[in-house]
């Protein structure tokens, strides 16, 4: 068992980046490669995928998540599990491993974005927003589920019988292995929920937890607990059966060294050219172009100064690349030099990655931050002199990989102070600035966006990230990524997400100067960059939308076909992600302003008009009603089509009626 979250040795972009590709075929292929490389090293189980919905980028583990949207979480769960486990209903085939969906449940919604903090939400929100990703994993026949560290409405997830038995086992019909997160059984005591190890073991076993990860609570206590207790013995027998069934499904009784004996240096696929090719494709499609004032793509002959602590940094794999090796990384400098030639553009570090005070807060990771022998002011002075002699400046900035990930919650999600000082110095030169951001979360980029001519969100892009970025900078690849999570303008907007409820006093343009509306007096309600947003080197025009019918009936298997025409009006061929949102105008519970229901990533040549069709069924219109039943309700629905959650130029309406 190991955390193979986004690659074994072939490290792909972090999961939050992967979902910005909106290419779930490619995400599945990456998971399949991860499984194959893991299989060759004798690993049988990975603790992936994580499908926790996250609306607060202060939380460090957002880097492992699919973002803020439920549909994206459902698709991510399904396709990653298919890539890891294959299509077999029971037996895990050769070159595949068992997946483990996590963290059950709602771990991605800690109060104030603080790691391991309590989660407090209504059951309605839990079911409508947070649980569908886990259910999708169960439907995909995931072999394991991992409990969460957090309390959910006052009850720690690992000891929560309602959550794990009644919902996961009885309602979702999950029959596989339930494993605790690291030491979570023992932490039932720390939570104040269990009065000692014996009660912790009892509570976890009653909640149908099968494996106690990394503590000896089960080992020390279960013998006494089941002695002369028929009910507890029955629970233990069921747990043992589920674990043995998993081993059987993996073929470990026939071959305990599954995968290892087939491996040799000659036939190993680890870091092979095909795997790197997939990593490059996924990196290119995950990168999001956030701003471009015509400065991109670059001409090869234009002299550009590449400045910043990430200009030649290999540690760009993200914190949870457990088996990854930074020496496999192609840096930004490597990628640019491969295209334009060595020594054609000047490079320099420009600033420290983070300040000493922040490094001290990283705990055991402090020693992984390089010792600085040159002052930040001296580095900035060198960078300014380099920039003065160049036509354009490329700034490679971002947070340290150790500032995100587990235990990486932050209250200020801006650029580290040394880098902000560098940015401030460069912007005074009035040079064209292309800013590249490496991060494991959406950062507050309001000032950076204002003073950059182009802005690229690279995330932590994996081993091929430098080549992918260079290909985008020089137009070899046309960016197509779109955000799977909103970028706030300021930390005070958090949590921020596109599918919010309307409120009784919405912030409408016609009420711009009306005080008593749902708005801030010192900040816009809108994010800096919205869910689904991302630019291309070409432009697209949404020409028309039509429906094949205006009425569909309940319980009739009616299908409503939405047809849209999209034209590539720019100078480049490209991929556009056409997005379909639905608004339920009225419901027995208040409905979001819009919800993503479908999308298609479509290749459109310059000058071409593409016709794209979507199918809407009654199933997509179902909601959790006030009594928590899941059903559709007759009424009016609006369909919106466009390029992001904020750019939806096409609208149609239809009605769902009773049979």
Predicted segments with their positions:
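Glycoside hydrolase catalytic-domain context in secreted enzymes
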Residues: 1-622, 634-646
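Short beta-strand elements
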Residues: 647-659
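Short beta-alpha junctions and helix-cap segments that line functional grooves
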Residues: 625-627
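Surface-exposed, short loops/turns at beta-strand junctions within beta-sandwich domains
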Residues: 630-632
């Amino acid at each position: 068992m190991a955390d193979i979250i986004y690659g074994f040795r072939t490290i792909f972009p972090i999961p939050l980046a992967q979902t910005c590709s909106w290419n779930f075929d490619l995400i599945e292929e990456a998971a399949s490669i991860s499984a194959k490389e893991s299989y060759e090293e004798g690993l049988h189980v990975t603790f992936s995928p994580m499908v926790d919905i996250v609306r607060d980028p202060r939380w460090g583990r957002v880097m492992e998540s699919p973002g803020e949207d439920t549909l994206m979480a459902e698709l991510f769960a399904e396709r990653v599990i298919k890539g890891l486990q294959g299509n077999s209903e029971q037996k895990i085939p050769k070159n595949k491993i068992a997946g483990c969906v996590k963290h059950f449940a709602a771990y991605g919604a800690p109060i104030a974005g603080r790691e391991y903090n309590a989660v407090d939400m209504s059951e309605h929100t839990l079911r409508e927003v947070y649980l569908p990703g886990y259910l999708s994993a169960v439907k995909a026949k995931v072999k394991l589920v991992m409990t969460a560290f957090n309390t959910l409405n006052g009850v720690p997830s690992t000891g929560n019988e309602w959550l794990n038995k009644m919902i996961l086992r009885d309602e979702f019909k999950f029959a596989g292995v339930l494993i605790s997160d690291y030491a979570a059984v023992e932490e039932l005591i720390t939570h104040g929920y269990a009065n000692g190890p014996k009660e912790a073991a009892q509570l976890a076993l009653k909640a149908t937890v099968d494996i106690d990860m990394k503590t000896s609570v089960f080992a020390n206590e279960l013998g006494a607990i089941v002695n002369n207790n028929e009910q507890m013995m029955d629970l233990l027998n069921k747990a043992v059966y589920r674990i043995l069934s998993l081993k059987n499904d993996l073929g470990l009784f026939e071959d305990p060294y599954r995968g290892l004996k087939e491996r040799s240096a000659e036939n190993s696929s680890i870091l092979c050219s095909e795997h790197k090719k997939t990593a490059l494709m996924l990196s290119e499609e995950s990168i999001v172009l956030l701003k471009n004032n015509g400065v991109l793509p670059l001409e090869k002959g234009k002299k550009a100064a590449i400045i910043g602590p990430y200009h030649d940094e290999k540690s760009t794999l993200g914190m949870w690349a457990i088996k990854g090796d930074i020496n496999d990384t192609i840096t930004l400098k490597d990628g640019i030099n491969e295209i334009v030639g060595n020594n054609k553009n000047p490079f320099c570090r420009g600033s420290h990655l983070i300040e000493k005070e922040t490094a001290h807060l990283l705990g055991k990771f402090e020693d992984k931050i390089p010792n600085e022998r040159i002052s930040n002011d001296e580095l900035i002075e060198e960078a300014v002199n380099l920039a003065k002699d160049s036509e354009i400046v490329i700034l490679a900035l971002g947070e340290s990989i150790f500032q995100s990930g587990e235990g990486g919650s932050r209250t200020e999600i801006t650029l580290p102070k040394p880098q902000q000082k560098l940015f401030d110095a460069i912007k005074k030169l009035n040079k064209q600035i292309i800013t590249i951001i490496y991060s494991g979360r959406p950062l507050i980029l309001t000032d950076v966006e204002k003073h950059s001519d182009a802005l690229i969100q690279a995330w932590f892009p994996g081993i091929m990230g430098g080549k992918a970025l260079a290909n985008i900078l020089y137009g070899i690849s046309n960016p197509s990524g779109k955000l799977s999570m909103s970028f706030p303008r300021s930390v005070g907007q958090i949590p921020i997400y596109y599918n919010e409820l309307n409120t009784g006093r919405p912030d409408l343009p016609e009420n711009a100067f009306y005080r008593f509306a749902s708005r801030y007096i010192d900040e816009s309600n809108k994010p800096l960059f919205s869910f689904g947003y991302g630019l291309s080197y070409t432009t697209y025009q949404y020409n028309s939308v039509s429906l094949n019918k205006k009425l569909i009936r309940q319980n009739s298997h009616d299908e409503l076909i939405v047809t849209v025409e999209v034209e590539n009006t720019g100078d480049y061929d490209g991929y556009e992600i056409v997005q379909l949102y639905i608004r339920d105008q009225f419901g027995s519970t208040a409905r979001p302003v819009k919800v993503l229901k479908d999308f298609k990533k479509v290749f459109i040549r310059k000058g071409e008009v593409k016709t794209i069709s979507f199918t809407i069924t009654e199933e997509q219109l179902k909601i959790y009603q006030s009594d928590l039943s899941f059903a559709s309700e007759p009424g009016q629905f609006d369909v919106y089509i466009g390029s992001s959650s904020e750019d939806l130029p096409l609208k149609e309406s239809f009605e769902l009626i009773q049979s």
